[in-house]
Amino acid sequence: MFDFSVIDEYQIEITSYCNAACPQCPRNDLGQGINPYMPLVHLARSVIDRAFDTDLCSRLRQIFFCGSYGDPIMHPDFLGILRDFRRKNPTLWLYMHTNGGVHDPEYWAEIAGIMNGYGQIDFGIDGLEDTLHLYRKNVKYSRVMANAQAFIDAGGRAQWNFIVFRHNEHQVEQARALASSMRFHNILVRKTGRFLNHETMEEIPAWPIKNSQQVLEPPINPEYRNTSMMFLPDLKKQYTAVKDYFDTTSIRCDAMIGRKVAINAEGVVLPCNFFNHNLYDARFRDGSLPGANPLSQHNGRNQIADFLSRYGLDNLNIHNNSLAGVFENTMWADLVNSWNNEHRLFECAMTCGSKFTKVWDQGGSVR
């Protein structure tokens, strides 16, 4: 069960703003323009401070600044938010994902000082100087590397996250060597599972970029391929209709097992970031987009949005309710019960089903 007394990690998307325009990110339209369904908002420092009092912070294991749409460094008061958590618990693990492409090196050195040995930054650096911009659009390689080095030099623990595409797979070993010389704690080679046609359950060979002749392609080297994506032909042979797999697979919820939940930039407490994707991702509204997902619909409505509306998003929001109060909502128990009946949510079966685990096959590391 999702129990307030045992949840010890909160994944907080403190903003939906971002400096980048990654073509496969749900916050923009294939690398051009902002997703019109997504609200642009910062989660106020005062709201976070009120929701996470000292008693709660004293028993938490981790605060993870990550989300579906935004980069935490775009929040105008991010350093203050970090300081609030550190003041309430000197050893609370503060973890974040970022592209690292804004602010000066002094800002990043300051983050290292606030973390003070209890935290980590994962820098999303998908390539080297000649390739990073092909996916991390609007991000300047030299700035990211200077900021990462400043963080490391100030005592910060950093991990290099490298999403492998065809255009950068030849640079993985160079990146490993550079990460070592810069004293990154680790380099995580991420095996993307995003090239998926949800309707045919086949791999998309090329992902378009709006107003560009460039396309994104999955890597060729089997070492960098997502295991579940390679398993797709076998999965289709096992089921007359792939929908049958999602209707019957056992579900092992990563969030519940990991004793963690997510809070989006509007302050809504959700089981995971994948629920947040369903709320605003254009691919769940426009079937013509690559990666669009018809199985997530029920009677023309997104399943997740419809499910949450029964309980009221306002009732799940930390602007209106304490975290303890949010977990008293019957939504949490109903969600768990849904995994064992015909009214299960497709997203739960897709993300945490037993045989097709493309999300977790991408690779991930917290500590």
Q: How would you describe each model-predicted region?
A:
Residues 12, 16-19, 247, 342, ...:
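Processing junctions and N-termini across compartments
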Residues 1-120, 134-138, 142, 196, ...:
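Conserved alpha-helical substructure of the radical SAM core
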Residues 18, 22-25, 253, 272, ...:
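Short cysteine clusters
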Residues 300-367:
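Cysteine/selenocysteine-centered motifs that mediate thiol-based redox chemistry or coordinate metal-sulfur cofactors
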Residues 52, 82, 149-152, 176, ...:
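Non-transmembrane alpha-helical segments in soluble domains
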Residues 5, 13, 28, 33-45, ...:
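Radical SAM enzyme [4Fe-4S]-AdoMet core and its adjacent flexible, acidic
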